[in-house]
Swiss-Prot record:
Record lineage: Bacteria, Bacillati, Bacillota, Bacilli, Lactobacillales
InterPro entries recorded: Com_YlbF, YheA/YmcA-like_dom_sf
Pfam families: Com_YlbF
Top-level taxonomic group: Bacteria
The protein's name: UPF0342 protein LGAS_1451
Recorded family membership: Belongs to the UPF0342 family.
Length: 117
């Protein structure tokens, strides 16, 4: 019998050897070494957490939060380190999405005979 958890753990190790993972890791190191970029990232992360908490609790976003969000987004668009990090993140998550689709295809295939034709 196959131990799927061993395979998952191996896949996690393999993920760290991919170009996409290494590129993101390098991009994050570059970001950490730029105090201005790191500060912007931390402000962006904190604001995203506030927005998520408000959404999860059904609270509307205040005008101040909306303005801060717009301001930070503009700063991010003008920050090379953050733009690079986001691009590298997207590439990594695209690869993970592709792998997830391949892994879950057999589940979808189980339902093929049930679908209306």
């Amino acid at each position: 019998m196959v131990n799927i958890y061993d395979n998952a753990n191996q896949m996690a190790k393999d993920l760290q050897e991919t170009e996409q993972f290494k590129d993101l890791k390098k991009s994050l190191e570059n970001l950490k070494n730029k105090p201005e970029s790191l500060d912007l990232y931390q402000r962006m992360d904190k604001l995203q957490q506030q927005i998520l908490a408000a959404q999860n609790s059904g609270q509307p976003l205040s005008d101040d939060v909306k303005k801060e969000y717009q301001k930070i987004n503009e700063e991010v668009r003008n920050n090379d380190e953050l733009k690079d990090m986001i691009t590298k993140e997207q590439a990594l998550f695209q690869m993970i999405n592709d792998v997830q689709q391949a892994m879950t295809k057999p589940i979808g295939d189980l339902y093929d005979d049930l679908k209306a034709k």
